[in-house]
Amino acid sequence: MYKHFLTSVLLVFFMLSCSKLSPFEGKMRECVQTSLSWRNDTTGIWETAGWWNSANVLTATIRYGAVTKDPAIPSVIEDVFEKARHYQVGVDSTGTPRYCDNFINDYYDDEGWWALAWIEASKLTGEKKYLDMAEIIFDDMTTGWSDACGGGIFWKKNPLHYKNSIANNLFSLTAIRLYKATQNPAYLDWFKKNVDWYMRTGMINTDIYQIEDGTKDDCTPNRNAHYTYNQGVAIAVLAEMYLHSYRMEFSAQILRNLLAAFGMSVLS
């Protein structure tokens, strides 16, 4: 099976190599070829990337497929879907292997990355099973919501621990993209509910326009850790707020200033 799959992928890449590609497409293909060479055929996961980063690599691969119409990519998506949905993510205190099923594990942010990947997979392929999986994952993410600190979801489960930017912005982003894919108003409600809470937490530091990592035990933001993925996902959420005309003036102002912190100018 592996040889057949690999042969199919290589054949498609060979066919693509015989056609004239723009320099941009050629570089993309180069990157994807290299990336696919690192994917473990048994687990479906990319070597050295680990669990949640493999979701990001898959998303990048899907976007490559959307741009280039590379016919090999749907097979890659299918292979990851079937092999990685039951995956060993570690061992417990007794040394017993721990597995995740349906891309659900002990960290809500990990789940968010996978949900977003499957939404994109559904958009590219038209396969409903990928969208169904994203909805299953999101449903589990909602179990992280609590009234502690006024709302929001936790980062970790078993036990529930730490309300932070990455888990909540991925939750909001998944909600709005599921709404766009399904038109189910419940997802829009979750999006609005969670972004309203997040905007009140102070995790968007408007003194320096950086995203704070999370909240302390007293529910105030900790102001000692800034990570680029927090900034990036927050920008994506604010862009969705703007596009959906939700708190548009506020989101435009914050988005403009966050991007300015990177030396970029938009929405002028």
Per-region residue spans from a language model:
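Bacterial Sec-dependent N-terminal signal peptides
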Residues: M1-P23
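Glycan-recognition and catalytic cores of secretory/periplasmic carbohydrate-active enzymes
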Residues: S19-S268
